[in-house]
Curated annotation (Swiss-Prot):
InterPro entries: Aldolase_TIM (IPR013785), RibuloseP-bd_barrel (IPR011060), Trp_synthase_alpha_AS (IPR018204), Trp_synthase_suA (IPR002028). This is Tryptophan synthase alpha chain. The alpha subunit is responsible for the aldol cleavage of indoleglycerol phosphate to indole and glyceraldehyde 3-phosphate. The keyword Amino-acid biosynthesis applies. The keyword Transmembrane does not apply. GO terms for molecular function: tryptophan synthase activity. One of its GO terms (cellular component) is cytosol. The gene is trpA. Tetramer of two alpha and two beta chains. The active site is at E50, D61. Pathway: Amino-acid biosynthesis; L-tryptophan biosynthesis; L-tryptophan from chorismate: step 5/5. The lineage of its organism: Bacteria, Pseudomonadati, Pseudomonadota, Alphaproteobacteria, Hyphomicrobiales. NCBIfam families: trpA.
Amino acid sequence: MPTRIDRRFEELAKAGRAGLVTFVMAGDPDLSTSLEILHALVRAGADVLEVGMPFTDPMADGPAIQAAGLRALKAGMTLRKTLDMVAAFRAKDATTPIILMGYYNPIYIFGVEAFLNRAKEVGVDGLIVVDLPPEEDEELCLPARAAGLNFIRLATPTTDAVRLPAVLANTSGFLYYVSITGITGAGVPDYSKVASAVAGIKAHTNLPVAVGFGVKTAESARTIACHADAVVVGSAIVDALRASLDGEGRATPACIGTVEKLVAELAEGVRSAAAAA
């Protein structure tokens, strides 16, 4: 049965454009503001929402997203509350796809079966769990897919033709191509290499390919959108939110508008790629 993610990418393909996937950390800077931000992202033009599950040791994340996770944890955010926040979002938005992104430890502690049951119940559509390789698919990937959730994997510039089939084997929804080596928010992608990498991946799969890491401006989003099925932006949004907080890291009246303005610019950049094609 198709998920919201599957349907959204079908809609984007029919519209002839790439999608915008936005990342924010659940509970940053607090639960109520975080929920408002999710709705603001959709208003601004986000096609798919990635919601970070706060964790104390986020090894793939750069300083911006690490700091966002710490703010969320300090504000009392938990995995249970993250799932509750998705339920609250779904009360007003039944169509926008939501992906939970993070690390396996909080899910393991919560209990895999309990987590998947609750995730499905509240309206989560997919998972990105960056520290579970394909060799560990029985831990979470296969149970998640059996529960009706997409399991989205990452490929990187170092994923070669020998490794790629294993990465793709149980991936569903889309493949997330990491455009740079290293942590989130570090550096700028080499756009010529991104184009060839996406083409190489598409030779092995019919899945949509989303490209992220290092996308910070409307222009860079536009450039990536010329080559990918979706553009993923996280650190730039998290940074904009941080800059709108007060000196104690608390929400201000500027938070929602600041994020909404940036994402509207990113969405326009992505959409302009289709207009120029």
